[in-house]
């Protein structure tokens, strides 16, 4: 088995250390480690993190391979420093059976760029009428533990209660896309001053907050786990904070774009800024940053949502909702959280690797950078500055809101069980 010596990297942003990888495992961490026959990476000034874990990725396969495949999506993930992603169920066919989740799991194994853990649908066809085969998906080769109808809300309270009760039996979690559909019919952007001035249908904060309030109470009643996808409002932060103070088993995620962008960008009518939940106000952005810093929000998740060119290069009302995010997430977090002093690099490792791995049960991921642990690692150059060029993306889609924007940081190397998937910033 080959050996690699990472020399002089700041492990989790701490003091410079050497890390010796032997095969799939970290063999030694310390200073002055002799290289021997190992390949040496000079990493002075760089940050070494555990491989990132994304709890919310849309890989689109099966069914929408025109926008992404498991292969292209995992290549994008590796480029962004990820060693594991959780693939959402809103594919065609929907991942609501053991057969479909096993197909996605197998495709992930074949890609080799990062581990893929399928997320199972909560309801058949994401229609909210009948529970999907939760037990069968859990017992399948994919071993599904996270279930979500993401893209749609499990808006029926009885259905949500039944789902929470069912997954409690095997320690699963329901990841809720919090959106009361009757309050968002025809919505095109955040409801507020900008939507009123532009004459666009508004997506009110209460449509998210009312579902979160209901579901944390249901989770408390059932004694089960609920995870809130892409939390986006200051009010949602307060509800989750209250729920945690009561000991309710709730976790929450925020996307990079909700940490940086606001609804003011919609004035351009550029559909690249159309996303669900929508970009909110500056007040919401600041509340989300503070909540991620203090732990009210547990993790950063990309909600990587690729779309083909024709679904975004059109008028606003006809455009699809969603943004790609795997290849820019870490840079946005560096800008919004590290360079503002809200998180250090150890905090980034916690929010983007340790905690998502625990929530999703990603075995071998989100582990300490120490001897005997799996060598799932990400090396980052924080001093790098560069404009985002989607033409260089590994993703099949280019719908990024950051095109031409200068962002800090660059993933130079990614290791999946000791094998380099990214070398010097390029896919291996």
Language-model-derived ranges and their functions:
Residues 55-68, 89, 117-130, 151, ...:
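Active-site mouth loops of central-metabolism enzymes
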Residues 131-300:
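Histidine/acidic residue-rich metal-binding segments in metalloenzymes
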Residues 106-122:
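A glycine-rich helix N-cap at a beta->alpha junction
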Residues 315-318, 371-426:
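C-terminal cap of metal-dependent C-N hydrolases
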Residues 197-225, 272, 293, 298-300, ...:
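His/Asp/Glu-enriched, well-ordered alpha-helical/loop segment
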Residues 1-50:
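Histidine-rich, glycine-flanked metal-binding segment
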Residues 9, 24, 45, 56, ...:
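Divalent metal-coordination and catalytic microenvironments
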Residues 46-111:
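Metal-associated gating/positioning segment near the N- to mid-region
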